Amino acid sequence: MSQRGDRGEGHARRPGRSSSFGGGHRGGGGVGGAGKGGGGSSGQPPLATNRSFRKSGNGHGGHQRAVSQPDTHGFQPAPAPTALQTPPLRPPAPQNAPAHVPVPAPRPQHHDPSGARAPTLPPSSENTANAPPLKGIPHAAPRAPSRISSTSTSQGAPKGGAYNLQFGSFPMNGGTGGSTMQFPARTSSAPPNLDEQKRMQALPEGHKVVPSGLVPQAPKHQQQQQPLQQQKQQPQSQPPLQQTRKDVVSSNHSSKPINPHIPSQVKSSVHVSPSVPNVAPPRPPVQQIPGMPMSMPFHHQAPLQFGGHNPQIPPQGVVPSSLQMSMGLHGANAPQVAQQMYIPTIQHHHQLQPPTMMHQAAGIPYGPAAHQLTQMSGMMNVGVAPQFTPQQPNKYVTGPTRKTTVKITHPDTHEELKLDKRMDSSGQRGLPSVQQQSQPVSTYGSPMGFYQQNSYNQSTMFYPTTSGVGQVPTVSQGPRFVSTQTVSYISPSMNTGPGSNKDNLAGSTTSGHSQVTGKPHPAGLHMEKSGVQTVTISAPPGKSDVNKLKPAEDVVSHRQKDNEAVSGVRKSGENESKASPITEKHPTPVSQPLQALAANPETTAAASFVVNSVPGDDGKSKESIQRTGSFKDSNKNATKDTRNLSQEPQSASSAEDLKVHTSVKDVCCGVSLMESKGVNKESEQTNAASASPTEMLKAADASSIDRSSARSTSESTENVQEVGKSDVAIGDSEKSGITNKVSPDLTKDDISSGSTGNESHEVCTLDLAEQLPVGASNPDNLDTATSVTDQGQLLKEPSSSVSDENVIMDRSHQSAEKMSDLVDDTVASVASSETLPESIIQNANAKGNTSGNQETGSATSSNILNVLPVPHSVASEDPLKPESMLKDQSSSAPAASARPVSREKPSVEITRTKFTAVKKKKRREMLSKADAAGSSDLYNAYKGPEEKVDFIGASESLDSSSIADHELPDESSEKEVNMGEDEGKKKVELDDWEDAAEMSTPKLERSDSSNQTTEANGRKRYSRDFLLTLAQSCTNLPVGFQMIEYASVLFPNLAGKSYVVDHPSPGRGADRPASRGDRRGVVIEDDRWGKSGHLFGSGRDMSMDNGPPTMNHRGAPGVMRNPRGGLINVGPVAPQMSRSGSDADRWQQKGIFPSPVTPMQVMHKAEKKYVVGKVSDEEEAKQRQLKAILNKLTPQNFEKLFEKVKEVNIDNVATLTGVISQIFDKALMEPTFCEMYANFCFHLAGALPDFSEDNEKITFKRLLLNKCQEEFERGEREEAEADKTEEEGEIKQTKEEREEKRIRARRRMLGNIRLIGELYKKRMLTERIMHECIKKLLGNYQNPDEENIEALCKLMSTIGEMIDHAKAKEHMDAYFDIMLKLSTSQQLSSRVRFMLRDSIDLRKNKWQQRRKVEGPKKIDEVHRDAAQERHAQSSRLARGSVVGSGPRRGAAPMDYGPRGSAAALASPSSQQVGHRGMPSHSRGFGTQDIRFEERSPLDHRTTVLPPRKDEAITLGPQGGLARGMSIRGQPLISNAELSSADSRRMVSGPNGYNSASTAREEPGSRIPDRSGRIAPNTQFAGPSNRPASQEGRSGNKLYSEDDLREKSISAIREYYSAKDEKEVALCIEELNAPSFYPSVVSLWVNDSFERKDMERELLTKLFVSLCNSRNNLLSKSHLTAGLATVLGSLEDALSDAPRAAEYLGRLLARFVVESILSLQEVGTLIEKGGEEPGELVHHGIGADVLGAVLESIKVEKGDSFLNEAKASSNLKLEDFRPQHLKRSKLDAFMKA
């Protein structure tokens, strides 16, 4: 298939070609050459799903498409090309051709810019389709061929005019002869790109049906090039496949040839159905299904994230149009070969949006089999998790593994620098040739090229199953906006100079992967150095030594969290940046690896690149961003934790070997080198050459522009110039509009630097791209600016270069916009940072001579951009993110992410927003103050781009004064920087131009006329240290400062963008955060940043890292994570929810900046502040305190609160009257608690003293009596008022009002009557008063009042027993005669008549309540009653279920749980009744009873009735009629004894006792209303032959001793609460264990020793009742045996209850009085008591007990009874009193 080689045009790639993801994504751009220099062509042809189809290479690797090689490459081995062999050149393009005009040119796929040859393909690989994935390091290719001509000679490369073949960002021919056009990406709203038109024309040619031979036709112009390219690409493991940008090439699992179907391309915005070429898939270990067409939405450029804990494989840019699916292999520590999954015969149209790209969540360890793929319809993606444990490293199931070493050849010596050697901290080989395992792409619906409501919706998510391996299968990532997405590059180690793409070799070299210099993605896509392929990087001849780089421990593999992809996409205007991100002829090709630096501090910044400015097509020198390739060896002892970067193997050659001219020093202005916390401080500080402080001071002293250029004190500019002979084409920033800024964002933890803290964090505050002056003078001047950081110097003076971490944070967080300020500051910061190389300063001077702008551009650009040494992090501009977002990127993405600028617009077109000097000054002041408060780092990060002021990252060691003195010499340079930075904002490729509207900040722009020299404006830069000294004095924000003004700019972007700071790329694959909350789909809207209108916000960087669930569940060590972020669960349970938001939340909560959506609410303050509880009047304060106590009064806390009342100083009559009034008010409104309030009055009367007033004694009782009378009369008066008709002049009352008033009066009267009765019971009132009250209530009984009669009945029920005695018998008879007459009167309502009847019956029954009067209950009583009610209900329900089911043996077991029988028919597991009657297994769904959560903690008894042997249990009514009617049967429950917990819980009746045995045989034994006590949990199945009458008592059941003990204790406790003797009797009967009764007695008596007197009294009554009962449940023998046991242990009991002897004596006395025991029997028990008989008497305890007995008898019955008892007992008291006791209680009775 012939296809055009135009820039914007993708080329049909051979489907069989698997990219060198190690089987995964193509290393370079989306297409073979898209990644330019990618080890192989991208495995997937670019799918033009982006809004703008200019983005020829949607592949993450690069933006440009390389011309695919002829088919012969894939199948026939060709001789390896020579090292300098260059691909065929395309026809010359006009130099002044518009950026967006496509110039047809093949993209060299595997060539270093310098012409270095690509790694050779192993000859054994016969078939490219089956060849193992290439492990080369992919280099993202610029969207358009680099226009920067490389001066380096490329042998055998035809120089075709102005054609410059570029490998990645490196010109393939290595010469400067011609410059290829680089075209900026444009969004769909931008004017149409001519290349699209050409593509339209070329399409018919390009889309020819591929012959069955699987040999796609190459474009005509490429067919000529095939010989050359074959030679070059054959060495490489994977030849690039041609693809058209809009082509979708389906892969076929089977190797059968398939004729691709190529629909015609309608227009650039429409996806063209790709031809479906036959692809030879890798041999899968699993049976493959020949082909499975699957409709799967393609997720554009979503690198599949590597889910393993170990080094991450660089993310592969998934070419949107490719149908091949990269399946990342899980690998522990060894390089893995990612397989490509081919889904043949899949076609999709752009219009349909759901391309067939299937992102597999976790790498499939075996060849993708069709059976593994889940067919999903519509928008749903297929998330396929590996069914088997991912293959361990080095175990590649697919096809023969192809190890391609990255060869970096020196152009002159052709010496190869091998990157194969694994040098990461783990000592294992990284995956240099293996593309980063595709990050799991969230299976969101369709790509987000346009905003579809459902395109990013979670509803379509398909979650892969988790794998058994420790590495959790990465969750598929969601698609990013293809239009502006830059594939986030994971390699943090890259320092993408602003000018240079993130793919700059400098960054890549540091990273284990040789990073392909990625050119800015046209669409602003984050170029992901996806698939870092093997790239032959020829070291520029300029380098004195080209040594093998040591692989930096940290590999560039770390993707930036938000796709702050390392796509060093720069503004289209940047000719140089476009031309070649880092087409550097200089030896700067690779940053020195950290290890090398650590090892050899002296090494010059070998890695630093000197960018030669190559004249662009427009004739302007292009600036290759000079980046300090050298990275601090973050960890000499690089621990895995510190390896923030995915630990991809660094190039085998050590960085030390790769040396740049030592004389040249790269200065990273504003780069703060953070001294590593301890490990290798010196080594870490490789990025910034640390100059001596004196040097810095000198630079600071220089006030002239030359000074601002940071004239180096010691280094000669000559060195720099030598190194930078290739001119750094800074290019007019106007045209270059380089928006690529070294993202100062690099977070402290740039990658995981925070983890060990060893890594020195360096942030290059300067944004070179922005710095480039518009009017930059000739590039020649600029080339001097290029300088290499002298790493040796840095290493030597680490401390000096060390900057405050906060400053670094400031840098890191500050957005690229801030970088503009930094650019102004760059010279200052450079000067301030001791690391400035002299040469750089001189260069700056030279440049400064040209113009102020130049100075800034050259010095800062060349110097500053080199600095970004954040260990492995390259600040990359995030094309999607506004610079405000970039702040986040730097922190989040360890890999420096250069923000790709929309390259489509020339820089001239870019509006350069400039801040007014005043605005900047205000911002600086504000930020300095915030910084002083310690909040500047993150606060600045969240400010709008225009508001961020970058603090100069001066080394802390530097004098702040020196920094302060240093001024940027030229305002114009500052202006340029601002312009560049603002351009970056505008150029940031938003997803849509509509979104760009939000980004527009015209108000922030400053007119060019305002540009003044820095000195003229008086603007100075101060170090953070110096500003901190002013923190104490500067505490107020500027006048008129409003936070919302800044938030307004920030929030629109925040709403839809990913934040680097918030979501830093974790240092390791395992640490990589799972899907972020801000990327949630429609269903889950972010609660903080959700912005109406755009679900995903403008320019939002759709998550390329919606990746695997965090395995370690920790983010990059130094990065602040969302405090609320939860760990996500793998699988559909917790989809995409791992981190709900950004760290902005934390700052929002701290009030550092306002809420993003709503302005801060102004708090309204009252003039007079209300203070709670302050009362001026002392008396009022007392009354309030008393009222508070009464409000809390309950039976439980009565005693405690009464003590508080006594603490209140009640010292006068007024206070006492107030207390009584409050008590009455409470009692009258709460009649139920009248008893408690009466008790309160009783205690209060005894505690309060008497008062005298006017010589009159005032007592509490008297005041209380007066109050009672007053309230009584008041009630009558109120009732009369309610009944009387309105008089004239009074307000008329409605009927309802009068009724309400009457009810209120009646309630108060009833409460008063009840309180009076309770007070009388407490002897607080006299009997005469009670009679008076009764008479008043009876009143005129001929015409009775119902309210009074009701009150009378209440009073009688309260005090009747006390007042009805012989003396008052006449009065009482008279009262009840009247009441009897009233009970038959028809004048009263039936309710009142029944009340009268009840009172009369009560008197007849000797005032024994038929049912207990409900008084206030304690909370435990309430719970108990509720539990009993539930038991009763469950019993009834259980009965009904059993009767209904019939006596079926084997019937489903009934669940008689306390909550009812909701689960009665649940699963058979309910047979296993567990504790509390709940089935031991969970109930069936929906069977849980509503009371499940209502169970009180006290309801811990199970209602299981202990099984009987063979006896049936009668259920149902227990009256005589009920006998014989209930179903009987044998319980299914085994007869094994239940546990004590179960057996002791048998209560289910109202009082908590189960009475299953109440169906007695004796006539009249029917106990009313006992049905609730039927054992609810017993289960009946088989019928019994026994007649019902033979059931007998239930006491035949056997219980263990423990069960009996617990049941007896439970029974007595229930008795203390319920006071129901009959219930205890029933419990004793059920126990049916007479032999255990003595133990019951001893247990109860011993328990009573620690109880209250009232409970002991109750126990005494119970014993008497049980002994005197008809059934004689407790015989005398049982009682005496139990008491003997008590006496035996009494000595021990005295230690716990010192008065136990006294308590026992009272009990025994009661037995004597009740004639249960005689005094003689009691004496015998005492005499024999003790552990040994007579021991109690010997110790004197017996005398105490007997003395208590005699004393109690005397008190209760008097002396006469006592004497009679003594006489009848014949006791000799002397026998009980030991002689050694001095005195005893018996002494008093012995004398008598």
UniProtKB/Swiss-Prot annotation:
Tell whether Protein biosynthesis is among the UniProt keywords. Answer: yes
The Acidic residues compositionally biased stretches are 1278-1289
Start-end of Low complexity biased regions? 216-243, 263-278, 432-442, 699-718, 1439-1450, 1461-1470
Molecular-function GO terms, alphabetical: mRNA binding; translation initiation factor activity
For this protein, the parts annotated as crossing the membrane are none
Chain residue ranges for the region called Disordered: 1-285, 424-446, 491-590, 612-659, 678-761, 874-912, 960-993, 999-1018, 1275-1299, 1407-1503, 1537-1600
- Stretches of Pro residues bias are at 88-107
Where do the record's region annotations for EIF4E-binding lie? 1018-1030
* Compositionally biased intervals (Gly residues): 21-42
* Keyword field: Initiation factor, Protein biosynthesis, Translation regulation
- InterPro entries cross-referenced by the UniProt entry: ARM-type_fold (IPR016024), Initiation_fac_eIF4g_MI (IPR003891), MIF4G-like_typ-3 (IPR003890)
Q: Name one GO cellular component term.
A: eukaryotic translation initiation factor 4F complex
Family matches, as Pfam families = MA3, MIF4G
- Where the record annotates domain MIF4G, the positions are 1183-1406
Single GO biological process annotation from the record: translational initiation
Is RNA-binding there in the keyword field?
Answer: no
**UniProt biased composition (Polar residues):** 147-156, 179-191, 491-517, 644-654, 1576-1593
Which spans does this entry mark as compositional bias, Basic and acidic residues? 1-12, 545-564, 571-587, 633-643, 964-990, 1290-1299, 1411-1432, 1490-1503, 1559-1572
Q: How does it assemble?
A: EIF4F is a multi-subunit complex, the composition of which varies with external and internal environmental conditions. It is composed of at least EIF4A, EIF4E and EIF4G. In higher plants two isoforms of EIF4F have been identified, named isoform EIF4F and isoform EIF(iso)4F. Isoform EIF4F has subunits p220 and p26, whereas isoform EIF(iso)4F has subunits p82 and p28.
The record's family statement is: Belongs to the eukaryotic initiation factor 4G family.
The record's function comment reads: Component of the protein complex eIF4F, which is involved in the recognition of the mRNA cap, ATP-dependent unwinding of 5'-terminal secondary structure and recruitment of mRNA to the ribosome.
What name does the UniProt record give this protein? Eukaryotic translation initiation factor 4G
